[in-house]
Each structure stands twice: as structure tokens, then as C-alpha cells.
Amino acid sequence: LGLDMSLFSDGIICDYNYVFDPHVYLKRFFGEGGTADPYIFLIDEAHNLVERGREMYSASLLKEDFLALKKVVHEYDAKMERLLEKCNRHMLQLKRECEGCRIVQLEEIDALIVEIGRLAERMETYLEDHDDSPVRNEILEFYFLLSHFQTIYDKLDDNYVIFAAGG
């Protein structure tokens, strides 16, 4: 009801996440098909906005997390295990190609992105089909991590930098 009433309001008071966070922003105002009207924002805690913006619009994946989940799902889903291994191999290749940290071109992670998409689809199917799985929470947590990564990946433009860290 609050969202519907907002269409008739001259002012909306809300947390800044509803304006800036890519997962919870008010899509009816700021998403595709939203109004073209100009907005004025009065932002509380604005001194934290730059750092929070970096957090909201950044995503990272760790190779070790793929391996850890692979061990967890080993007994429960062979297809998911294989997809986790494929992602791990792509990340291992990136890791081996860098000493310390290096900027990565978008094309260099294309194959990884495809496998992440397949993995996310498999996880979604598993989660829908296995409400009572003993590994559900671990899969769900990793699924949200992948989902956030995919959301940020879809927003990539010249303002983003992708980097890989070895070690």
C-alpha cells in the first residue's frame, strides 16, 4: 500500500537503500519505465554514501568458496558439483595469470560468467526441488552471492574495473 501511495506523494521519506541499492531500489521510480520527473533527495548519513555505494555496486567471488561448496554438495548433487568445479577452474586460470593483483578485461571472464549463469540456474532448481535438504542453507547463501555478482556484472560499463588477485 505504501508503494502505491508513493505515486501520489510529493515527498517520500525512506532509507537511502531504496534509492541507491541495486537490489532494493524503488524500481517504479528509478527502473526502466519509471517516470522521467526530476527528483530531489535529502539524504541522512550522506557522509557514508560513497563507501556504501562502493559496497552496493561491487561484487567479489573467491575461488576457495567454490571449492568449499563443492565439498558440501558432493553427496547431494553431482551436476552442481561439476559446475562448481568448472567455475573453480576458470578462477584458477585467472589466479595463475596474475602476480598479486591485475586488471582483467571483460572478455577474459566471459567463460566464467557463462558457467556462473549455469551454476545459478542449477542452484535455483535444486533449491526449488529440495526444501528440506541438509545443505540448503549453504547453497542458498552462495546462490545469493552469485545473484549479487550477476546483478553487478549486468551493470558493468566504463565506470567499473574488474580485477583478479592471485596469491
Give the predicted meaning of each segment:
Residues 1-18:
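Conserved P-loop NTPase mechanochemical-coupling segment
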